[in-house]
C-alpha cells in the first residue's frame, strides 16, 4: 500500500537490469542468482545469512489487541479523503471504523456518506518505529469476495515528511485486492524501484486459498543485507530481496527506522480496477497481533 499508489504490480523478475536482487519462490532461498548483484557477506558480527541467525531473536515490542480499546500508546489514526494519491474513495475516520474485541483488532470499511465520500474506513499508524528485525502480523482478510477493497499491512520510512515518497522507502508486508481473491502480494518501493517507473520489487500474486477464511502470519526477516517475506513460517519465503552490492539511498533506504500502517482502502487505481461491489460492506479485516523480534 503506497503512500502514493499504484498501478498493477510489475513482476520482480522482469526488471533484473535494475541494481538490486530479488526473487520469487515457493521454497526457501539461500541466495539470489544474479552474479553481479549478490549482496556481499557481512564482514563483522554475526552472519545474517546463517540458517540459525533468527533463532535467538527476542520479542521487543508487540500489540496483542487484548481488552476493548485501541492502545493510544501504540497507534494513531491518519484521517482524510484526499484520494491518497491513488484515487481511493474512502474517508479515513478516527472513530467508528475500529473495534478491539475478543483478542483482535477489527478495521471496518463501511458504505456511508461522510464529507462527500461514499465510504469510510480506518488507517492506523504505529507511534513506535523500528530498524531491522523479524516482523510478524497475524491477520485475516475480509471474508466477502466482492470487488473493490484493498487491505494492507505495511511500513514507511520515518523520514517521509522530509524526503517524501518513494525516497522514504516502503515495505509492503501484505497487500490484497478483492477482485483477485485467494492471492496475496509482497512489495518493496524506493526511489530506484517503484510503480511510477514500473520497477517496484514484488512477489507478484502469491496463491493463498484460505486467505479470506483463516488467519495467516505475514512476516519479514529484515537486516541491513536483505528482506525476506514469508507466510506463516520462516522457511516459506515468497520474496527475497538482497541489498544491492552498490547500494545508496535510492535503492536501499531500508537501514533506518520505519513505522507500521494497517488499513483498508476502497477503490483506487489498483483496488478499484474492476469497480466496487457495494454488497460486500461492511468489510472487516481482523488483526490478531503485531510483533517485532530483534537480535
Which residues fall in each region the model found?
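GH16 jelly-roll
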Residues: 24, 28-295
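Bacterial signal peptide processing site
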Residues: 20-22
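Bacterial N-terminal signal peptides that target proteins for export
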Residues: 1-8
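Low-complexity, intrinsically disordered regions enriched in charged/polar residues
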Residues: 9-10, 182
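C-terminal motif of bacterial Sec signal peptides marking the signal peptidase cleavage site
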Residues: 16-18
Amino acid at each position: 500500500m503506497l503512500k502514493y499508489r499504484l498501478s498493477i504490480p510489475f513482476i520482480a523478475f522482469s526488471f533484473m537490469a535494475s541494481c538490486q536482487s530479488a526473487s520469487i519462490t515457493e521454497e526457501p532461498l539461500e541466495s539470489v542468482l544474479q552474479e553481479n548483484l549478490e549482496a556481499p557477506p557481512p564482514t563483522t558480527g554475526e552472519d545474517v545469512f546463517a540458517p540459525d541467525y533468527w533463532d535467538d531473536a527476542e520479542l521487543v515490542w508487540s500489540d496483542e489487541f487484548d481488552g476493548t480499546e485501541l492502545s493510544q500508546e501504540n497507534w494513531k489514526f491518519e484521517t482524510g479523503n484526499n484520494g491518497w494519491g491513488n484515487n481511493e474513495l474512502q474517508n479515513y475516520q478516527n472513530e467508528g471504523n475500529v473495534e478491539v474485541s475478543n483478542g483482535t483488532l477489527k478495521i471496518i470499511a463501511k458504505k456511508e456518506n461522510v464529507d462527500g465520500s461514499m465510504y469510510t474506513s480506518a488507517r492506523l499508524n504505529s507511534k513506535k518505529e523500528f530498524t531491522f528485525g523479524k516482523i510478524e502480523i497475524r491477520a485475516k482478510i475480509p471474508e466477502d469476495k466482492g470487488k473493490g477493497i484493498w487491505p494492507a499491512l505495511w511500513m514507511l520510512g520515518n523520514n517521509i515528511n522530509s524526503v517524501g515518497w518513494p525516497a522514504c522507502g516502503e515495505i509492503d508486508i501484505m497487500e490484497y485486492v478483492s477482485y483477485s481473491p485467494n492471492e496475496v502480494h509482497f512489495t518493496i518501493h524506493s526511489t530506484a524501484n517503484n510503480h511510477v517507473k514500473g520497477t517496484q520489487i514484488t512477489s507478484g500474486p502469491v496463491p493463498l486459498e484460505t486467505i479470506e477464511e483463516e488467519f495467516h502470519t505475514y512476516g519479514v526477516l529484515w537486516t541491513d543485507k536483505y528482506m525476506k517475506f514469508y507466510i506463516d513460517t520462516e522457511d516459506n519465503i515468497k520474496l527475497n530481496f538482497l541489498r544491492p552490492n552498490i547500494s545508496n539511498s535510492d535503492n536501499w533506504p531500508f537501514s533506518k527506522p520505519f513505522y507500521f500502517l494497517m488499513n483498508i482502502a476502497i477503490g483506487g487505481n489498483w483496488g478499484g480496477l474492476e469497480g466496487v461491489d457495494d454488497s460486500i460492506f461492511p468489510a472487516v479485516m481482523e488483526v490478531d497481533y503485531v510483533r517485532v523480534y530483534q537480535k
